[in-house]
Amino acid sequence: MSTEHKQYLSAVTLAAIGVVYGDIGTSPLYTLRECFSGHYGFDVRPDVVFGFLSLIFWMLILVVSVKYLTYVMRADNAGEGGILTLMSLAGRNTSSRATSILVVLGLIGGSFFYGEVVITPAISVMSAIEGLEIAAPALDPYIVPCSIAVLTLLFVIQKHGTGSVGKLFAPVMLVWFLTLALLGLRSIIANPEVLAALNPKWAISFFVEYKSVSFFALGAVVLAITGVEALYADMGHFGKFPIRLAWFTVVLPSLVLNYFGQGALLLKNPEAIKNPFFLLAPDWALIPLLILATLATVIASQAVISGVFSLTRQAVRLGYLPPMRIIHTSEMESGQIYIPVINWTLYLAVVLVIIGFERSSNLAAAYGIAVTGTMVITSILFCTVAWKNWHWNRFLVVFLLMVLLIIDIPMFSANVLKLFSGGWLPLSLGLVMFIIMTTWKSERFSLLRRMHEHSNSLEAMIASLEKSPPVRVPGTAVYMSRAMNVIPFALLHNLKHNKVLHERVVLLTMRTDDVPYVHNVERVTIEQLSPTFWRVVARYGWRETPNVAEIFHRCGLEGLSCQMMETSFFMSHESLILTKRPWHLFLRGKLFIALSRNALRAPDQFEIPPNRVIELGTQVEI
């Protein structure tokens, strides 16, 4: 390995530590404390401490190290990961019915992420700020205002991008993980018998001894692996090897040392359960640790916010969410984006959650159900990919799925039991997003099908125009066409009302391919349909934002010259009229109309100069 490659690998691995592992890296702030919360009724006794530590350790090994880093990360689409990517891969070689089921599962998983993303910033920052009550108990009433203030600042700076401050994320998180390791190691040295919990017999004995109560406690243990989906979702940014290298060399050892250090502290001083993380530190280090913890939780929150921006863009490009304003905050990094409506909706939800739950311990009950639900779906989708796409032995796939679900389903079931103590929150938020995504996709499909049914053949219309040509005016007209062989509504209305055509007519169709990026040489396909008609198909990946200026530039390179300021863009604007429906479909239709009215207009989507756009309205019944 060359020196340059080693330096590059080190830099990417460090960057992965700063972004990928923020959520799971801040879990020690609250996980072990929640295991002994009043919900489960466990006393701080050695066998219970050993049991929880053993469960946490083997959860990190089996779920993170084996399931995600060894298996799930094999499933990539041109290097990209994430639940929607896995959904797309799983549906490539299955029947239409199976594909529909897999799509529903993928959308449920994506919806769970929206539910989780509201909780992560709130519980992370609150857990860090709660260190104030250890340093100065009189400051306890200020935990909620301080948490809101920190998160307000974080959401405000989103529109400016995080490129400059983002360079500090990796060093800060590296210091954080080293601090976790040192604090834990210091406590373990004072009480080394805690290392006995590495033996899985303690986890097994815990279940045997405490039976059903130990099953309920899985709802707290799972907090140790929240954020595990980020490893897969961020695979496209950093690559598989750097993410794996960061986990096994820095993150996993630091987490294990800190959890076991907290356990050693509890063996020595059971009263430390009120906040075992901060009580690991000597008195002189408490304030610096509080500041570092706050920075780490802010970085973890930033990673989650960036993740929801990326997921939203992917959902928009794949047609599961209406078009919305997406702002690129960096000229160098295409992945750095800002979506105002998502940013401020998320901010409002996070603030309401902090005010409503008041303490991170109250919010912990809501955490986990979305994470474990996504884990179950990930296992099913991954095994489908292994069977249908990679042609693994069917019996091997069934065995692997059973092993994965033996781990996933008990954790999900334990969290479902927390439904009425907070679990309803991510489920409700996820349900809202699922309804929005399925409504937009299905109603949009029905609308386009209805419009196509009432449209004539494009080839027949062109042939008719060649035989009986209308009046021609100078210039080029571009008509946005959703389907290649269908006459755009705007073209029909222009002929009907104005009875003229431009000298040159371009039918432009935007296509989103099932890949993150499309090579420039494959960007544009040009076909001349007649002496005056051209069809242009522009292809983009779901990580890209279409741009008409770029399309025209590519057209010019291939012989079709179009000057933006000398071209008129004709677009249709549909006014939707709701027909008589059953009540549930009526409500869905109302939601679709509301989403359509607030969707980003096509000129803004494709960055077309407003003074070159002509919109023609039409009424469509749905």
From Swiss-Prot:
GO MF: potassium ion transmembrane transporter activity; symporter activity
Family: Belongs to the HAK/KUP transporter (TC 2.A.72) family.
Membrane topology reported for the UniProt record: Multi-pass membrane protein
Regions crossing the membrane: 9-29, 46-66, 101-121, 137-157, 165-185, 213-233, 247-267, 276-296, 337-357, 363-383, 395-415, 416-436
Cited InterPro entries: K+_transporter, K_trans_C, K_trans_N, Kup
One annotated GO biological process: potassium ion transport
Function: Responsible for the low-affinity transport of potassium into the cell. Likely operates as a K(+):H(+) symporter.
Protein name in the entry: Low affinity potassium transport system protein Kup
Alphabetically ordered keywords of this record: Cell inner membrane, Cell membrane, Ion transport, Membrane, Potassium, Potassium transport, Symport, Transmembrane, Transmembrane helix, Transport
Organism from which the protein derives: Yersinia pestis
Catalytic activity: K(+)(in) + H(+)(in) = K(+)(out) + H(+)(out)
Subcellular localization, as worded in the UniProt entry: Cell inner membrane
GO cellular component: membrane; plasma membrane
Origin superkingdom: Bacteria
Signal peptide: none
Main location per the UniProt record: membrane
Gene: kup
